[in-house]
Amino acid sequence: GKPYKGGREGRMLWNCVDVRDVARAHRLCMETTVGGNGSRYILSAADRGGELFTWQLQALLESLYPMVDDIGGEPMHGEGGDVPVKPTYDAPRAYCLLAKQELGLETFDLETTVRDTVDSYYAVGLLGDETS
């Protein structure tokens, strides 16, 4: 892939949400007896484990897809190329705790979300052939 050029030179905090969790939360909102008309829920990462800085997302993608030559992302340095060149702003954090508590939302873990997302991109040809 190409290096990500958005944000602060590719550096950002990713609050990862699985679209399947969003769909499930919508269904649970319709079925709940706890929430009422006008109830609001933040559908974001379940906890800190669902938040990654760009360099952490790069490392996860590299571990899941070692056959990809260049994952892209923010510039790295250090002995193993595992230290960001510049620090990333640690953005304010929000989680879907209320949706988990009131609706009983059970979220997909981050690795499953990332793997299933990338695998779906390969399946529809957005990333070419997974073996190349």
Model-derived segments and spans:
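Conserved C-terminal active-site "lid" loop/helix of NAD(P)H-dependent oxidoreductases
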Residues: 19, 79-104
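Mid/C-terminal beta-alpha module of Rossmann-like enzyme folds, strongest
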Residues: 24-82, 116, 125-132
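Alpha-helical substrate-binding/gating segment
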Residues: 1-41
